[in-house]
């Protein structure tokens, strides 16, 4: 979709009082989605919610630019993340994006910028793409690698969450 098509879809969803979920894995797609939401702001307050929660939910959010993490809370947009993808993608990330590893799943940064776990930071499973094992996402979010990964080998360990934060992200907001 073009940015204008995305903005038009958001406008239609708003007119019907429907929430919108957008799949955006990389930082370009995340930014385009947030930009489309900002374009709609003149007509729709950011605090508009549907019966299912905030108006906009962005699925995956595996790479987010530093400039965009504060925009989630400012726009009342949900970052719906599946941390388990870190475990399945770890070799590809190291091989293809070694210079961008610090931007992979910036979970701590989202929280620090106002995305409270269970409110604007949600975790999900992404079944059937990955196995239905929440332990994988707990490991990925807390260890930032596979079980037993030393901290100095973790991907962006400064983005680690506590188990309590993970439980909140899994349990609330749905």
Go through each PLM region and give its residues.
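Active-site-adjacent "gating/activation" loops or surface patches in catalytic cores
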Residues: 1
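Well-ordered alpha-helical segments embedded in enzymatic catalytic cores
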Residues: 5-9
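His/Asp/Glu-enriched, well-ordered alpha-helical/loop segment
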Residues: 11-21, 28-56, 60-61, 66-77, ...
């Amino acid at each position: 979709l073009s940015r204008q098509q995305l903005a038009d879809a958001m406008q239609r969803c708003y007119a019907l009082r429907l929430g919108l979920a957008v799949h955006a894995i990389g930082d370009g797609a995340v930014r385009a989605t947030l930009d489309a939401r900002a374009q709609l702001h003149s007509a729709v307050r950011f605090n508009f919610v549907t019966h299912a929660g905030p108006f906009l939910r962005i699925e995956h959010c595996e790479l987010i630019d530093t400039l965009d993490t504060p925009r989630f809370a400012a726009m009342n947009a949900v970052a719906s993340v599946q941390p388990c993808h870190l475990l399945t993608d770890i070799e590809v990330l190291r091989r293809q994006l070694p210079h961008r590893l610090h931007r992979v799943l910036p979970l701590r940064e989202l929280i620090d910028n106002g995305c409270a776990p269970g409110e604007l930071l949600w975790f999900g499973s992404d079944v059937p793409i990955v196995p239905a094992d929440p332990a994988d996402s707990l490991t990925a979010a807390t260890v930032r690698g596979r079980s037993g990964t030393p901290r100095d080998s973790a991907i962006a360990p400064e983005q680690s969450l506590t188990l309590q934060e993970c439980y909140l992200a899994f349990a609330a907001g749905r």
